[in-house]
Amino acid sequence: MIVKSLDHLNKISEKILKKLDKKDCLFLVGEIGVGKTTLTRYLINNLQKQKGLSQTEVLSPTFNLLYEYEISDFKIMHYDLYRIKETKELKHLGIFSNELDAVKIVEWPDLIKTPLEDKLEIYLRYGEKEDERKIDFKGQGKWKNFKHEI
């Protein structure tokens, strides 16, 4: 699918949000600057708006590795694993520990090999025009057919 504007990307985030539940996992894959954090920002800000809360700034957690957002009954864990080089480093982050009743949004998920029940992989690529992006979806569990629902 070709995304022609930020408004279009925002509409896609709204469709993802309609299906999003606690414990879901979103993997964002793409080059630096392609829009992974922008999509995350839209998801978080739209959820805040939906819950009647003011919108917060959503930054890339490249240096912190993780930013957490408490949005009413939702907890969102936004990870950026760009600087992680070995799988053993992932264990220290505890991304998939069972006690985490949270949505996990993971940028640069390449090292994650844990099988997950409900996961949506979102692939972002630069389009032919400067402001275009190509986006594709690969889902597991309840996300399996999301590509056809959008």
Name what the model sees in each region:
Residues 36:
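Conserved lysine of the Walker
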Residues 88-90, 96-150:
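Short phosphate-coordinating micro-motif centered on Lys-Gly-acidic
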Residues 62, 66-108:
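Conserved nucleotide-sensing/catalytic segment adjacent to the nucleotide-binding pocket
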Residues 1-15:
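N-terminal pre-Walker A segment at the start of P-loop NTPase domains
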Residues 45-57, 71:
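Post-Walker A helix-loop "phosphate-sensing" segment adjacent to the P-loop in P-loop NTPases
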Residues 31:
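P-loop (Walker A) phosphate-binding loop of NTP-binding proteins
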Residues 16-23:
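Phosphate-binding P-loop
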